[in-house]
């Protein structure tokens, strides 16, 4: 990941919210978040997508219900990583995976926000960013949890880096 103030501020915020103390496949949540951000950087994702990947679990997710920040604190994250990256974090966190994932092979997808119940249709750029963050997240989880990989019929060592 690029070495600049926003990445430093984002990681400092995650540390103040104890991400380094929460267990996650492959170590701690903070380690997972770093790996997701690094994977996105390796893939050449935009700076905003990398920042969103680094912070993707800030509000919890459909698969990881622990939140580091309350939704009322969106401004705190926005100040650290910028508006566009924070909006991607919210999109990722608010995603009802069971509703959204089956649509990801389509040019457009409707998202039911699990926080508000509202339905939205992200623009193509946001949808692409969501898919990139999702792929980086899921790859990291199965690489670091043989039980989850086996549950989904995957062999983590066989996944491309």
Q: Model-found features: residue ranges?
A:
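Membrane topogenic helices and adjacent juxtamembrane segments
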Residues: 1-19
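Divalent metal-dependent catalytic cores for phosphoryl transfer on phosphate-bearing substrates
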Residues: 16-23, 29, 36-158
């Amino acid at each position: 990941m690029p070495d600049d103030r926003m990445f430093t501020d984002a990681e400092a915020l995650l540390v103040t919210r104890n991400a380094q103390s929460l267990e996650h496949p492959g170590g701690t949540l903070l380690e997972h978040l770093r790996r997701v951000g690094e994977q996105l950087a390796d893939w050449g994702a935009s700076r905003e997508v990398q920042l969103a990947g680094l912070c993707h679990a800030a509000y919890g997710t459909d698969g990881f219900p622990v939140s580091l920040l309350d939704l009322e604190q969106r401004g705190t994250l926005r100040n650290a990583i910028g508006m566009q990256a924070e909006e991607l974090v919210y999109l990722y966190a608010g995603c009802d995976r069971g509703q959204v994932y089956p649509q990801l092979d389509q040019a457009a997808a409707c998202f039911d926000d699990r926080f508000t119940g509202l339905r939205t249709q992200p623009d193509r750029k946001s949808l692409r960013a969501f898919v990139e963050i999702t792929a980086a997240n899921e790859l990291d989880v199965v690489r670091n949890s043989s039980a989850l990989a086996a549950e989904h019929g995957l062999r983590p060592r066989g996944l491309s880096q």
